[in-house]
Amino acid sequence: MGPKKSDKKGGKAKAKGGADGEVLGEDPLQFLQNYTRFSKLIGVAPNPKVVAQLQSDENQPLTQASTWYTFTIVVDDEHGPLGPGGTRALTTAIMGTGQDMRGGPYRLMKSLRLWRARCGDEGARSIAEVLRLGGAEVQLEYIELFDDNIGPTGALALGQALSIGCNKSLLSLKLDYNPSLGSEGTASLCRGLRTNSSLKQLHLPYCDLGADAGPALGEMLSFTKLQLAVLNLQGNRLEAEGMKALSPGLARNRSLVYLSLADNGVGSGDADVAALEDFRDAMMSCSTLTHVDLLYNRIGERGARVLLPALAPENKSQIKHFLVDATLPTPLFEALHRRDTGGGGKKGKKKGGGKGKKKKK
């Protein structure tokens, strides 16, 4: 089922029976009323952080709707996890579809950020419903679900909501620190995203992706409709096998600008060197790719030498930003490592450089 079409004609929809200038779906206090009512109806306590944001003076309705005004909900675990039920209450209020709700969908909602909210698969499915059915009425552009216990079922729902013919508004999807996602969840997500032509950023750091996630990621990258510019896979375990499987899709891709495979267990053995050869060729074939991060992969001298042609001036390398592990011998490190500093030159190795501590945002 595709997204609902807006009933707007040349402007904002007016509330039925309302005063002149009243705009349907742009009153945060009405949104708050819908949220608290539905929360009580399903037996969950309204989240104090959500309530505070909707009551803030900065978010009160204007006399006339402003086209630049947008709204972001940010929820963490300060008052306890939001949970699946709390997430359902929030998304139902966003859509304005719950029992006795007024005002319609909350049109100003553009960003949703849930940190350690433990929304789980059920919560992810309710967010997917907003993406799938919101259409022109709820145009979410940015979703950030950090450490929310999302697994394959939730990933499948998000992928389906973002497949061709469904959502066209979402630009960034961040699912960092969801280890229950794994390779299975990544494959489910990629099946939907491979036909998406609007998403620009996908972040899956520390989601326990294994080597078997490589084929799904590579297949997604190979689809011509895909317009993804940023793919962040830091902190997983793709290793040599996953890198090798991803490379053919990368070679055919014509949209990716930034790719992070930092801290993915790529080493210096024979299989690793062979995978790095394929990855090098893919980098040279992907004409849009300018930023690559391979930090914290101990590729060794053999692996480093394999990558050199991808950055050689005589090969007309387009790579502006290339990060490699600081444990490499200094000459090789300096031949490979480069940072895009907005016009500045290459920077040398820092003393004592090594793997940094993983931090949750």
PLM-predicted stretches and their roles:
Residues M1-K361:
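Leucine-rich tandem repeat or coiled-coil scaffolds
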